[in-house]
Amino acid sequence: AAKELILVNSIYPTRVADALLAKAKVGNGGAANFIIKYGLYRRLLGMRNAFSEADDLVMLDDLDACNNYELDLNDIKNAEIPISIILGSKDRLVDLKAVENFTDIVPSQTYTMDEVGHFSFFEDPVELSRLISKIV
């Protein structure tokens, strides 16, 4: 059984913007550029390599899955495990209103990493690891 739930640069519900979905319908490259533009705070060389260039529209599948995923927040609320949310202070992809709604319903602790965007695991992996170690 899980002992801790940690959401990193994520929240439920995750709603993907129509503009990003439109890019993903055309191809992975345009969606990747959008995510990097709005999600990345620190400039990282090679970041584009983290995204598929294939013609399989795998990003569209993933983004559609975010919008279509459903669960009952009361199930999470009653799970009786500690829940932590780790966000980047410069993340423009996570909906802060959704974070507020989630934390109003589900007992949880929110942590914010300074000067980090949506990709904390790339932008500041040492700080993210330190924070996760502190939580668990």
Which residues make up each language-model segment?
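Short, structured coil segments at secondary-structure junctions
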Residues: 1, 79, 105-106
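Conserved hydrolase catalytic core segment
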Residues: 1-16
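Hydrophobic/aromatic beta-strand patches that form the interior of the parallel beta-sheet core
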Residues: 6-8, 84-86, 111
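Conserved alpha/beta-hydrolase catalytic His-Asp/Glu region
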Residues: 15-78
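Hydrophobic "lid"/C-terminal helical patch
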Residues: 63, 102, 128, 132, ...
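Short beta-strand/loop motif that positions the catalytic acidic residue
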Residues: 79, 85-87, 91
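Conserved alpha/beta-hydrolase "acid-adjacent" motif
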Residues: 92-98
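Catalytic histidine-centered segment of alpha/beta-hydrolase-like enzymes
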Residues: 93, 113-129
